[in-house]
Curated annotation (Swiss-Prot):
Database matches in CDD domains: serpinA3_A1AC
Organism placement in taxonomy: Eukaryota, Metazoa, Chordata, Craniata, Vertebrata
A Pfam family the protein falls into: Serpin
Glycosites: 103, 183, 233, 267, 321
Gene: SERPINA3-6
Name assigned to this protein: Serpin A3-6
Keywords noted in UniProt: Cytoplasmic vesicle, Glycoprotein, Protease inhibitor, Secreted, Serine protease inhibitor, Signal
Positions in coiled-coil regions: none
Length: 414
């Protein structure tokens, strides 16, 4: 007969942010002498699973409130959960990785971690054209002893920092973690954790910081207040940017949507997807990795004589416990085996929180966001009006990773 136990708690903090500031790279690259070698596994081999997870998580978040903005980093959530799985055993690790859409008969657990290691190394390469930093941190109760193997795997595979923390003083612990987050996001996310239990033993944090400039920038002198149609009976005024450029474009008659891709100076890109009026929920239901591949293969350079895109800044803060449970990741909250972290099997996850912030302006994308596109044709002229709800996917070219995914329903709401 099983007896009830009061388990120590573990929390996951996942955050994404970006703004016009300098960023700092993570710890140095892994040397050839490291215990864990990077194999032929690379970001592309993870792209399909990560994209599948991204769309599955998006659908869950969008269903909770179809009329709200959605912004999150699927890559950040994936990295945090994969990081957690380093310390999981048995059905717990299987549930986490299968929940992340990995087929463990095709991709062994070791290769998954090596793939994320490769992604982190790729993301944190210095660049003059892109500010991108991805990192992990462990905040651990002062007297808690972590297993040496977990510490080493966390450092080598996930570039993780570690900080002793007194969770028995939850306010001080919360301040320590939130200050770390605020510093790493240059003040963009100020309060990732709103509260912590004094029973917390461990907090894992993942962050993404992103800043990129458009290859063809908008002229601020041409930005004007314009109507944005939130719904049939609600209209708001937003600052609307405008531009004349040649850029990849595709009209999908089958799904009833229009796509425009804007490229950053780094050659990464933001894909804006505008469903026809009344088609948003139909389109959301059909989002799959295969659909994204079809869209990207169908994009062709076209001259857009007038592109109108709203300038906006939005934030989000999600508690993902219920959402992840609905996606099949349940054991971590109830009867987890996380004995690979401390050597005992009495840790459970108390909360998974995710914060995101996105600014889009004339210079480029800061963080992540969503934008949309409406199309008018007058003979050979193409006019793209982003004046109703739309989707956005920010994709990193080198790995085809979706670093941000979202929906902008109302650009005037922060």
């Amino acid at each position: 007969m099983r007896t009830e136990r009061v388990s120590p708690l573990l929390a996951l903090g996942i955050l994404v942010a970006g703004l016009c500031s300098r960023v700092h790279c993570l710890p140095e690259n892994v040397t050839p002498e490291e215990q864990h070698k990077v194999t032929s596994v690379d970001g592309h081999s993870l792209a399909s699973s990560n994209t599948d997870f991204a769309f599955s998580l998006y659908k869950q978040l969008a269903l909770k409130d179809p009329n709200k903005n959605v912004i999150f980093s699927p890559l950040s959530v994936s990295i945090a959960l994969a990081f957690l799985s380093l310390g999981a055993h048995g059905p717990t690790v299987t549930e986490i990785l299968e929940g992340l859409k990995f087929n463990l008969t095709e991709t062994p657990e070791t290769e998954i971690h090596q793939g994320f290691q490769h992604l982190l190394q790729t993301f944190n390469q210095p660049s003059n054209q892109l500010q991108l930093s991805v990192g992990n941190a462990i905040f651990v109760q002062e007297e808690l002893k972590l297993l040496d193997k977990f510490i080493e795997d966390a450092r080598v595979l996930y570039s993780s920092e570690a900080f002793p923390t007194n969770f028995r003083d939850p306010e001080a612990a919360k301040s320590l973690i939130n200050d770390y987050v605020k510093n790493k996001t240059q003040g963009k996310i100020e309060e990732l954790f709103k509260d912590l239990s004094p029973r917390t033993e461990l907090v894992l944090v993942n962050y993404v910081y992103f800043k990129a400039q458009w290859k063809t920038r908008f002229d601020p002198k041409h930005t004007e207040k314009t109507e944005f149609h939130v719904s049939d009976n609600k209209t708001v005024e937003v600052p609307m940017m405008t531009l004349d450029l040649e850029t990849p474009y595709f009209r999908d008659e089958e799904l009833g949507c229009t796509l425009v891709e804007l490229t950053y100076t780094s050659n990464d890109s933001a894909l804006f997807i505008l469903p026809d009026k009344g088609k948003m929920q139909d389109l959301e239901a059909k989002l799959t990795p295969e659909m994204l591949t079809r869209w990207r293969n169908s994009l062709q350079p076209r001259r857009i004589h007038e592109l109108y895109l709203p300038k906006f800044s939005i934030k989000s803060n999600y508690e993902l416990n219920d959402t992840l449970s609905q996606m099949g990741i349940k054991k971590i909250f109830t009867d987890a085996d996380l004995s690979g972290i401390t050597g005992t099997a009495d840790l459970v996850v108390s909360q998974v929180v995710h914060g995101a912030a996105l600014d889009v302006d004339e210079e480029g994308t800061e963080g992540a966001a969503a934008t949309g596109i409406g199309i008018e044709r007058t003979f050979l002229r193409i006019i793209v009006r982003v004046n109703r709800p739309f989707l956005i996917a920010v994709v990193l070219k080198d790995t085809q990773s979706i670093i941000f995914l979202g929906k902008v329903t109302n650009p005037s709401e922060a």
